[in-house]
Amino acid sequence: MSAKNTTVPVSTRFTREGMQVLFMAIFVLLAAIMREVNLLIILAGTLLAILLIQWRVCAKTLIGLSTYRRLPRSMHSRKGFEVELVITNPKKWLGAWLVLAQDRIKYVSADVASEQISQGIGMLYSSIAPRSTCIQRYCCTTQRHGEYQFLGTELTTRFPFGLLRGIMPHNGGDTFIVQPAIGKLTPLWLELFGIRTSNARLRQTRSLSDEGDFFGLRAYRPGDSPRWIHWRSSARRDELVIKQFQQADSRELIVLLDLFPSSSLDQQHRDSHQKHEELAIEFVATLASHIASSNFGVITVAIADAEPTITGRIQSRSQSSGLLDRLALAHCGEEDKIQSALSLLEREFRRVENLMVVSTRPQVAFQSQHNENTAIIFWRSMTWLDASAGDLTKYFAPAE
């Protein structure tokens, strides 16, 4: 994330101790004037000089400091990730001491009532030398996937006497996306490809060459067949690598994520519907992530939410990253958009053997609202998984 150029002026405020010293200085000064005692005038001047030094040091310490954040490539909900906050001191001679940086994060939602602001995260930088940088890290865990925004970093210092607090705010606005949590698939998930559970272990250990042509190498993973270890490349790389084969088109899974809007005004029902929606999104994200990382097949996902989209033929981690970002931002709109998503799939494939629909409503509700005589029918069979009815528990265990 880009650094912020700190041209914001530094403001100073009295601390409790500073107010006490200021009160003492005024009291001593008034007493010295009334009594005409020179020693009291000197004492009052000394106290005021200390406050003046404190004010100048606070202001000069923070001027010129810039902040910079580093985030991981991918972040998932309910899984902690580290945020690096880097402070750079470009000044030639003056360092910075006892700088407290406070960060805050806000969950950005289409529903204003759902927006949440985190507690302030404080990090103390004991010393930042001239022309140097200092790094602090903090761990962040989000309970929901979606878009988040930094509200800005506030740098403060009370150095050297703690009588005044220098404050320099840094404008926020930087956003980042937290991808859905990745759960675990049960062995029964292979049924979605038309593979019987009894043959699951056999299919996992079979040679990948039965499914296509050799096209590259990849790192060895537990469960891979030793028959396909490429020994020459393994010796050269000093690690086990195996041959990788192009998957057959028959192992393509076409998924439609149906985020049906809730029409109920009851808050408890809406909260329950939101949980089912998040469960459906996490299941599709886990499915796509597993297929892309295991080189098992190809997956195409169409999302029927407020803005229907389609992401086709995901078969690598780099491709699945974009899909996970899109799933993180998926949310139901005010209207049913499943017909628009079906149109996107129909234009992409023309004909589909098996269409898997992951929905937040029962199939009966879909059939009652869409007349089969007028709706687009381009699939030979349909597998309907209703998250609200617990259909996903057979194939999926959510992340804790």
Task: State where each predicted segment sits.
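Extracellular/lumenal glycan-associated context and N-glycosylation machinery
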Residues: 1-68
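Acidic, glycine-rich A-domain
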Residues: 289-400
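An amphipathic, basic-hydrophobic helix/alpha-beta surface used to engage anionic
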Residues: 39, 49-310
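Secondary-structure junction/capping motif
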Residues: 9-15, 275, 336-340, 391
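Alpha-helical structural motif
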Residues: 25, 48, 213, 227, ...
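A generic hydrophobic-helix recognition signal that picks specific residues
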Residues: 28-29, 251, 353
